[in-house]
Amino acid sequence: MIINHNLSAVNAHRSLKFNELAVDKTMKALSSGMRINSAADDASGLAVSEKLRTQVNGLRQAERNTEDGMSFIQTAEGFLEQTSNIIQRIRVLAIQTSNGIYSNEDRQLVQVEVSALVDEVDRIASQAEFNKFKLFEGQFARGSRVASMWFHMGPNQNQRERFYIGTMTSKALKLVKADGRPIAISSPGEANDVIGLADAALTKIMKQRADMGAYYNRLEYTAKGLMGAYENMQASESRIRDADMAEEVVSLTTKQILVQSGTAMLAQANMKPNSVLKLLQQI
């Protein structure tokens, strides 16, 4: 029987200390809901989890970018539909005045409407905007360098595409003459020429709208793909980083029992020197 070193108490204290640390770690996992709260918990798991988290955040933003692109195209296509309707009306008036039964006075009255419609084409081109960007004044035509028209549709560098919108002013659509005056229908011959000009303008608009429709569908498929990738990537990160709550509760219960028993055993070990004291009292 010795008194200078209480090895039982030392061993009990060591076990108690480690079990208390384990309880703290388990409680941290339960309170945060995450198995990995620091690199010390799982260094390799944390590294993989952080890479996955980077991709998850990037995919989520890329999906939003794609939806913004879809909104942009919808807005532009809506304005372009108005322009198309206006030119359809100009074409009808041109066909009407190509008929020789109308007097010069009649043609002048029709010309007033044609001129107003041409002005409306320019009004739409000047006022059609998305986030203060002019849509139809050539800012997004091929050859321009507007960085804002790059749609970034992926979580990584260079995963982007550019969309082009042609100039849709009356000048670009050839609805005005070289001197800036609107196209004229002052004679059956001029009215007949306007039919051809209207057809050419409508062809340009229809091609642009077809491009918009195709690109919109592409963005829609891209958004669906990004949503699927986002969900799968997030599930992968969750499996690595998140805590299994049922497993952690079982672990906490076990470790708490060990702490309680360790505390009791430490108390018992600290009682050993008292036995020596009682022995000495009997001398």
UniProtKB/Swiss-Prot annotation:
This is Flagellar filament 35 kDa core protein. It holds the Pfam family Flagellin_C. One of its GO terms (cellular component) is periplasmic flagellum. It comes from Leptospira interrogans serogroup Icterohaemorrhagiae serovar copenhageni (strain Fiocruz L1-130). It comes from the Bacteria. The flagellum consists of two outer layers around a core that contains several antigenically related polypeptides. InterPro entries: Flagellin (IPR001492), Flagellin_C (IPR046358), Flagellin_C_sub2 (IPR042187), Flagellin_N (IPR001029). It is found in: Periplasmic flagellum; Periplasm. Keywords: Bacterial flagellum, Periplasm.
